[in-house]
Amino acid sequence: LSGSEKIYKAHTKFKFVRNRNFEVYGEEKNMIFHYAGKYNGDESSLPYKEHHPNATPFKEPEDTKKLSLIANVGCILIMGILAIPFLILGIEYIPDNAIWMMIGGICGGLSLLPHELLHAICYKKDVYMYNDLAHMLMFVVGTEDMSKGRFIFMCLCPNLILGIIPYILFLIFPQFVGLGLFGIICIGMGFGDYLNIYNAIKQMPKNSKTYLCGMHSYWYL
């Protein structure tokens, strides 16, 4: 293998591949994770597939700049709303938990990578991860077909594990203010996923399937 192609075998039945040329290694039945590096802004450089004859594009933002703007504004709004019960319940615990607040905030800010990895493990075939840190984005792209339910689960998975569950635990045990702050940040960072879930629920008919091609989602019956 060359220096840019390092394969890491996990205990589960998938492999991690660093590969910028979209070559496939290993058995077909294994999910293979490809770290593709920095997104260059050219959608034609992303993985693509031949469109299904009856494919209909999602009505969604056309480029990463518009998407990042919507996602960042939505993120701030959601975190602002969630901060209200956080302050009401946790205000008395914050002074004595400054270190845990700092840890929760730092971990929340660093959760972008595990967030995308949790998206990736929902795929059964090749999935590619890119970073676009100039627009505060990381994203994964996989071109396999998914049912409406699996697509919604894939979008929701990291937000549930990293955000919603920790925040609910804080609501039950408000002394865990660091965990609550972590949950707030992780829930807010998933705003782009909530847009995808909304689009799937609103636009995809019953029994339809969806797939990604470049930056855009399509559905078909």
What are these regions (language model features)?
Residues D96-L112:
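Short pre-active-site segment immediately N-terminal to the catalytic Zn-binding motif
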Residues L118-D126, I165, A200:
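Active-site-flanking alpha-helical
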Residues S111-K124, P158:
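Active-site recognition of the HExxH zinc-binding catalytic motif
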Residues Y128-M136:
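Peri-membrane helix termini and adjoining interfacial loops of integral membrane proteins
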Residues L1-N30:
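N-terminal amphipathic/basic-hydrophobic helices that include classical n-h-c signal peptides
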Residues F86-P95:
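Short, hydrophobic transmembrane alpha-helix segments
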Residues I32-F86, L137-L221:
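Metalloprotease/metallohydrolase-associated module, dominated by Zn2+-dependent proteases
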